[in-house]
Every structure is written in structure tokens, then in C-alpha cells.
Amino acid sequence: MSETTYVKQCAYGKTLVRFMKKDICPKTKTHTVYEMDVQSLLTGELEESYTKADNSIVVPTDTQKNTIYVFAKNNDVSVPEVFAAKLAKHFVDKYKHIHGAALDITITPWTRMEVQGKPHSHSFIRNPGETRKTHVVFSEGKGFDVVSSLKDVLVLKSTGSGFTNFHKCEFTTLPEVTDRIFSTSIDCNYTFKHFDTFEELAGFDFNSIYEKVKEITLETFALDDSESVQATMYKMADTIINTYPAINEVYYALPNKHYFEINLAPFNIDNLGSNCSLYQPQAYPSGYITCTVARK
């Protein structure tokens, strides 16, 4: 061990552990599929595996991978927060020198296909415009912390948004607009209250909360007469926190994907202001607005 350095922090695990699980309803024979990417990170009395090459305290990452697969086979995975918590608790309970586990799950969304006007029993279509994630940490003797996410939802509205009365200086060239296209890719994290026990956590309907967070986000985006991205994202977060007492904090990152008016004056065509109907999508640069709203 060096006399001048020490291990300030360490964790290790397995990433990109992918699986798809198929559930079949005994009554209807209807199939449901769940595709997930899982990452595990363990913490505890691990310093000597770094400083003294002591592998006796290393639970192999391959063991962690196998554990994830066995737990996926033998347990319900339909609620990713609960599945992640069960895995995290297992790692800490089983290995005495492991005192914490962080599990991250990313869900690949498959939507049931409609065929001849009816939901098909075993055919699905990939929904590329939405990513659900969860991050669950279990600490020995302290309980669970859960942060879930809605990401990669690309939205646009063609009116109902403006940007005026902003600060101006010698570097300002942006004109004020009372009507503009508002487009963004939604990135939302929502943090739950601390859970002392697995039983308390398992009693929460995380799936319906996820759907409601998405509904509030999209409804606010569509209905708000937006004066700025900042004002709209605050309304989204404020509504979520006031709807769910179990959610203590909401974070949004909303890149402002610009669509600018195309100047057709050289062709004697007015395509500016209220006469604008033709826009040029801008790949970059884009605005990038973030906000974390917390319960008082």
C-alpha cells in the first residue's frame, strides 16, 4: 500500500446484462414481454482488492451477472423498481463484506401490436420514442433510495409558445417572438422518499406512477401557453410533486430544438412573423435548460 495515497471510493459490478422475459397468462394464454439492461455495482470492504490485489473479497462480476439471470427467471420483473430492490438487497444480505448495492435498469419498450383491430396475443412493436429507467440503492441498515426516469420522448407543438422580455445586451441578436415552434426531447428524473424496508417499497405502484408522470409531462407541454421552457418545465415538476406525496424531487432537462423562420423575401414571399409557415430545423446549437424542483 502506498504511503501517499488511499482508496477514497470504490465500486464494481457488471453492466449491460441484457435479458428478455416472457410471461404467459394462465387463463388467456396472452404473452407479455420484458426486455431490460441491468447494471450492478457493489460497495463495502473492498479496498484491499485494489491495494493488495486480494481477490478473496471480490464477488466476481460474472457471479453478479448469473445472479441477475436467476432472479429474473424466478421473480416478477414487471415492476423494475421492485426487481432492482430485490437484487440489491440480495447482494448485501448474502455477502457480509458488501454493505451497499446500486442497481440500474433500462427498459426497452415493446407495445402490444393491434392486428385486425384487436390486441394481438403475442406480437409486439418496438416504441423507439421512450426510455424508462430506474436507479435503486440499498445501504445496509439504512434502506432504499429510488430514482426513476422518463427519457427520450421527442415532442413538438406548432403554436402556444413564445419568448419575450428576455435580457438584452450588445451580444443579443435574437428577436422576440410571441408564437413559435416548441420542440424538445424530454429527460425527467423523479426521486422518491426514502424507503426503510423492502416491504414498504414493494407496496408502491411504481408502474402507474410512471404512466402518470408521463401523462402530466405531456399534458402540461401540450396545454401550457408557454412563455419559456423554464416556466413550462417548472409547472410539470410542480404538478408531479403535488400529485404524489411520495415524490420528493423532480429533475428535468429539456433541450430546446430550434425551428427557425426561413426568409423568403428575396423571392417576394412573406414568410416572417404571423405569415410564417415554413421553418428550417436546426440540428445545433440548441438551448439546454435544466431544473430540479424539490418539496419544501
UniProtKB/Swiss-Prot annotation:
Gene Ontology CC annotation, any one: peroxisome
Which reaction does this enzyme catalyse, per its entry?
A: urate + O2 + H2O = 5-hydroxyisourate + H2O2
Q: Which GO terms describe its biological process?
A: purine nucleobase catabolic process; urate catabolic process; urea metabolic process
| Keyword check for Cell inner membrane | no
Q: Which residues cross the membrane?
A: none
Which top EC class applies here?
oxidoreductase
Annotated positions binding urate: 61-62, 163, 180, 229-230, 256
Under the GO molecular function aspect, what terms does this record hold? urate oxidase activity
Record's subcellular location? Peroxisome; Cytoplasm; Nucleus
List the pathway annotation.
Purine metabolism; urate degradation; (S)-allantoin from urate: step 1/3
Tell me which UniProt keywords the record has, alphabetically: Cytoplasm, Nucleus, Oxidoreductase, Peroxisome, Purine metabolism
- Residues making up the signal peptide according to the UniProt record: none
InterPro entries assigned: Uricase, Uricase_CS
Any Pfam family from its record, for instance, is Uricase
**Active-site residues from the entry:** 14, 61, 258
Q: Does the keyword Cytoplasm apply?
A: yes
Return the EC number. 1.7.3.3
Q: Which family does it belong to?
A: Belongs to the uricase family.
As for what it does, the entry says:
Catalyzes the oxidation of uric acid to 5-hydroxyisourate, which is further processed to form (S)-allantoin.
NCBIfam families associated with the record? urate_oxi
Which PANTHER family does this entry report, sorted A to Z?
URICASE
Supply the name of the protein.
Answer: Uricase
Source organism (scientific name): Schizosaccharomyces pombe (strain 972 / ATCC 24843)
Query: Taxonomic lineage of this organism?
Result: Eukaryota, Fungi, Dikarya, Ascomycota, Taphrinomycotina
